[in-house]
């Protein structure tokens, strides 16, 4: 099964997430099929908090990819902002 989820990056206590399409069996931060964007929960000032290619996300959802709960809410947020 293919899922759209977040892969954690960044430093200790400074999370930064890539939003990726991956096989459900692969590790959280491991192999992925395609990168759709990023999410920075600690963005300050002029930093971008969320960047997501909504068209690619919609295409993967149409193909049957299942988004995680958090990614589903981020897709909704990105659509509203666009």
UniProtKB/Swiss-Prot annotation:
The keyword Ribosomal protein applies. One of its GO terms (molecular function) is structural constituent of ribosome. One of its GO terms (cellular component) is cytoplasm. InterPro entries: Ribosomal_bS16 (IPR000307), Ribosomal_bS16_dom_sf (IPR023803). It holds the Pfam family Ribosomal_S16. One of its GO terms (biological process) is translation. Keywords: Ribonucleoprotein, Ribosomal protein. Gene3D superfamilies: 3.30.1320.10. NCBIfam families: S16. PANTHER family: 30S RIBOSOMAL PROTEIN S16, SMALL RIBOSOMAL SUBUNIT PROTEIN BS16M. Belongs to the bacterial ribosomal protein bS16 family. This is Small ribosomal subunit protein bS16.
């Amino acid at each position: 099964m293919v899922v759209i989820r977040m892969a954690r990056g960044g430093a200790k206590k400074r999370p930064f997430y890539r939003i990726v399409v991956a096989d459900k069996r692969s590790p959280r931060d491991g192999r992925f099929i395609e990168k759709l964007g990023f999410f920075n929960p600690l963005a300050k000032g002029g930093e971008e908090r969320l960047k997501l290619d909504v068209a690619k996300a919609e295409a993967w959802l149409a193909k049957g990819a299942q988004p995680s709960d958090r990614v589903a809410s981020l897709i909704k947020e990105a659509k509203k902002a666009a």
